[in-house]
């Protein structure tokens, strides 16, 4: 009997395409694209910058913009190599890392608005421009399917703020002489 089962390769073979999470793709003007996969307990976002601005170092007014539009993001916890608080790190951090922190803040705000007493979400932004195209960030969040109802509005809010930040002035916001590392990892967390 066992032998007969093993001879049939299609028996008990799941359709892997049905088990794979759906990738949602978004293009944000000429600024960046997002490929989002929401899993049971986490969300993966691949962010591709569509221009050569890689760092907030090239946006000297970044702290003022955040203070005006989302001051609470400056209080998010940041785990970086130098141990800098986010309100300092934000002056010279990668665009993908900034996106992560803004999204974490909006996730917390939306969860509390929905009725939660507390909210904690963590994120990790990685990049490796030796392996991947320059400007690609891999963002992992502790926001799974149970929070699917707050992810979509948080993404919309994050994209709106990123459009303000990256399109603040019609002049080029980037310097050709950037000193961003070819690969790296940064983590963040927001507790409300």
Which positions does each model-derived feature cover?
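A common structural junction motif
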Residues: 59-74, 156-170
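Intrinsically disordered, low-complexity coil segments
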Residues: 9, 111-116, 148-151
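Metalloprotease/metallohydrolase-associated module, dominated by Zn2+-dependent proteases
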Residues: 121-192
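Polybasic, low-complexity association/targeting segments
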Residues: 2-52, 151-156
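Long, Pro/Ser/Thr-rich low-complexity/intrinsically disordered regulatory tracts in eukaryotic proteins
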Residues: 48, 53-58, 100-101, 105
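M16/MPP (pitrilysin/insulinase) zinc-metallopeptidase core fold and M16-derived inactive scaffolds
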Residues: 70-142
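Generic "edge-of-domain/loop-turn" microfeature
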Residues: 52-56, 109, 146-148
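Catalytic zinc-binding patch centered on the HExxH motif and its immediate surroundings
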Residues: 21, 26-39, 61-68, 115-138
């Amino acid at each position: 009997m066992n032998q007969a089962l093993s001879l049939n390769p299609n028996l008990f073979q799941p359709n892997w395409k049905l088990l794979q999470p759906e990738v949602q793709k978004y293009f944000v003007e000429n600024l960046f694209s997002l490929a989002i996969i929401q899993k049971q307990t986490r969300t993966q976002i691949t962010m591709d910058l569509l221009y050569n601005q890689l760092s907030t170092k090239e946006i000297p007014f970044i702290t003022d913009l955040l203070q005006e539009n989302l001051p609470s993001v400056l209080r998010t916890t940041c785990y970086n190599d130098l141990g800098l608080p986010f309100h300092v790190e934000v002056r010279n951090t990668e665009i993908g890392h900034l996106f992560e922190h803004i999204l974490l803040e909006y996730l917390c705000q939306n969860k509390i608005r929905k009725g939660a007493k507390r909210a904690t979400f963590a994120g990790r932004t990685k990049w490796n421009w030796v392996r991947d195209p320059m400007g690609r960030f891999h963002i992992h969040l502790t926001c799974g399917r149970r929070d699917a109802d707050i992810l979509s509005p948080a993404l919309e809010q994050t994209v709106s703020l990123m459009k303000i930040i990256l399109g603040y002035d019609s002049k080029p916001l980037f310097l050709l002489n950037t000193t961003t590392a070819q690969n790296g990892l940064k983590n963040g967390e927001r507790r409300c």
